[in-house]
Amino acid sequence: MGLSKQRVVVEAVRLADHEGVDGLSMRRLAGALGAGAMSLYHYVANKEELLDAMIDIVFEEIELPPEDTDWQSAMRRRAISAREVLARHPWAIGLLESRTSPGPANLRHHEAVTACLRKAGFPVLMATHANWLIDSLVYGYALQEASLPFDTADELADMVEDVFLPQLPSDEFPYLNESAAALVAAGYGPPEEFIFGLDLVLAALEPLRASA
């Protein structure tokens, strides 16, 4: 299969998903594509341009706020989608807002989010505040989730039983034992914590829609 910019960028995303972005080099990427390193510069001028294109692919995967529903539902769906996408591409968490040459999907995404908030009645500056606040929750949670030593509620339950509780004598840490038992009994997992925080943020923003 011949090279194209799309193939180069998709392969770069695949490598970053498996190996992280720090070790991604044009030489490593060329090897994965079975091509010479210099041939890649026909499609991307340098690593920064490659990262711009990779981030654009990530933004393409995030659902835009739908226009056929209320602003809270629309921003909720978009935030949940963003968290799911960043769980697939954790290397992108620190890069999403760092690009000085954003691609078309990146720009479309930010335009759609801003439009959703403005059409809902948020004044210009308040729409910016709302956008930053929601994104801070999404990116902060994604970063925290990427560092957790478990992925699912079942894995958390096993870790609590086998790893955490043996380190927590009940007479010394009664409240941590209480919390751990409640979480395991509830089948609690990382996504529930994100939804809890997201719904609080959206509810808190609602009264600010008509503020000057």
Q: Which residues does each predicted region cover?
A:
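Actinobacteria-biased recognition of intrinsically disordered, low-complexity terminal regions
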Residues: 1-6, 210-212
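A contiguous pocket-lining binding segment that forms or flanks enzyme active sites
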Residues: 112-165
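Hydrophobic alpha-helical connector segments
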Residues: 63-108, 124-127, 131-134
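C-terminal peripheral helix-coil segments that are non-catalytic and often amphipathic
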Residues: 119, 147-212
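Helix-turn-helix
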Residues: 7, 11-49, 53
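Amphipathic alpha-helical interaction segments
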Residues: 7, 49, 77, 108, ...
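Short, basic, alpha-helical segments at the C-terminal edge of helix-turn-helix-like DNA-binding modules
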Residues: 57-61
